[in-house]
Amino acid sequence: MAIRVKNLNFFYGSSQTLFDINLEAEEGDTVVLLGPSGAGKSTLIRTLNLLEVPKSGELSIANNEFNLSNAMANPKAIQQLRQDVGMVFQQYHLWPHLTVIENLIEAPMKVRGVSENEAKTDAMELLKRLRLEQLADRFPLHLSGGQQQRVAIARALMMKPQVLLFDEPTAALDPEITAQVVDIIKELQETGITQVIVTHEVNVAQKVATKVVYMEQGKIVEMGSADCFENPKTEQFKHYLSH
């Protein structure tokens, strides 16, 4: 099992925003988190590599296990978690003062101890795969939103994660670039990596999901295979899909 979440509860201050979350994903699954704004999708995905720290529950992901009531007690374990579980943010978070290739090689050299030559070789292979090799020496400022998003995906893949998390990867991208990101997610499926994707775009979800998690108000309302799109089991999900 690549991901197992058990009885996860999350609070912002005194306000509870995730309630008793339970979910599992097999290796190679592409799990899509759907739901209206405020459902808790982005909070949930950020708990999967402890960017947000739950109050209670259990998390097992990419062979890292945490009792969430004291998850921050072991900084080394968290560092390992973040090597094994990559994250692609909605806002890209590229370092503006570094070129594309420098953005890619920074973490592998500092965190994994990879040599500069090896890191650059890996980076150029990834950039070719994502059709970005001609941008290697450009700065993020000179890239389009779609190019920045693909560079952000490449940067996350440089750490060779077992699980990759995407928070709204196609938000604010035009249809052509959205299609490119969908193609990348499909290509990654063939490598066996496990992916978790937050999106509000049902058509994107339908193209990539092997597993669907529908949320409202911090709770999982429906969970199942991609068949859920054709045969939703709950009125809430049926209503969501009809809009």
From Swiss-Prot:
One of its GO terms (molecular function) is ATP binding. Residues 3-242 form the ABC transporter domain. It is found in: Cell inner membrane. It is an enzyme of class 7 (translocase). SUPFAM superfamilies: P-loop containing nucleoside triphosphate hydrolases. SMART domains: AAA. It catalyses: a polar amino acid(out) + ATP + H2O = a polar amino acid(in) + ADP + phosphate + H(+); L-arginine(out) + ATP + H2O = L-arginine(in) + ADP + phosphate + H(+). Its EC number is 7.4.2.1. The complex is composed of two ATP-binding proteins (ArtP), two transmembrane proteins (ArtM and ArtQ) and a solute-binding protein (ArtI). PANTHER family: AMINO ACID IMPORT ATP-BINDING PROTEIN, ARGININE TRANSPORT ATP-BINDING PROTEIN ARTP. Belongs to the ABC transporter superfamily. This is Arginine transport ATP-binding protein ArtP.
